[in-house]
Amino acid sequence: MPKRVLQGVVVSDKNDKTVVVKVERRYSHPLLQKTVRQSKKYKAHDENNQFKVGDLVSIQESAPISKDKRWVVLTNEAAG
């Protein structure tokens, strides 16, 4: 099964080798017929501490790294 890849914004880089990425998804509410925004935060592994708050990044699912970390940062999307 392929690994999931998500895009989000780094909201915290205070932990060593870890960033918190906020991923937002939009969907149409079945009853209200409105577009609803929903967000979720993922802890992702950042080996070199190179990503800072506000960076747009891609994260990929991986094997568990710690109790909460199951994602790895792939690339900085803003850089291209």
From Swiss-Prot:
Q: Quote the InterPro entries the UniProt record gives.
A: NA-bd_OB-fold (IPR012340), Ribosomal_uS17 (IPR000266), Ribosomal_uS17_bact/chlr (IPR019984)
Among Pfam families, the record links this protein to:
Ribosomal_S17
Question: PANTHER family, per this entry?
Answer: 40S RIBOSOMAL PROTEIN S11 FAMILY MEMBER (PTHR10744), SMALL RIBOSOMAL SUBUNIT PROTEIN US17M (PTHR10744:SF1)
Name listed for the protein in its UniProt record? Small ribosomal subunit protein uS17
Quick check: keyword Magnesium in the entry?
no
User: One GO molecular-function annotation for this sequence?
Assistant: rRNA binding
Which keywords does this chain's UniProt record carry? Ribonucleoprotein, Ribosomal protein, RNA-binding, rRNA-binding
Q: Please cite one Gene Ontology biological process associated with this protein.
A: translation
Record organism: Brucella anthropi (strain ATCC 49188 / DSM 6882 / CCUG 24695 / JCM 21032 / LMG 3331 / NBRC 15819 / NCTC 12168 / Alc 37) (Ochrobactrum anthropi)
What is annotated about its quaternary structure and interactions?
A: Part of the 30S ribosomal subunit.
Family in the record: Belongs to the universal ribosomal protein uS17 family.
Gene encoding this chain?
A: rpsQ
Q: Which GO terms describe its cellular component?
A: cytosolic small ribosomal subunit
Lineage start: Bacteria, Pseudomonadati, Pseudomonadota, Alphaproteobacteria, Hyphomicrobiales
Entries under SUPFAM superfamilies matching the protein: Nucleic acid-binding proteins
Q: What does this protein do?
A: One of the primary rRNA binding proteins, it binds specifically to the 5'-end of 16S ribosomal RNA.
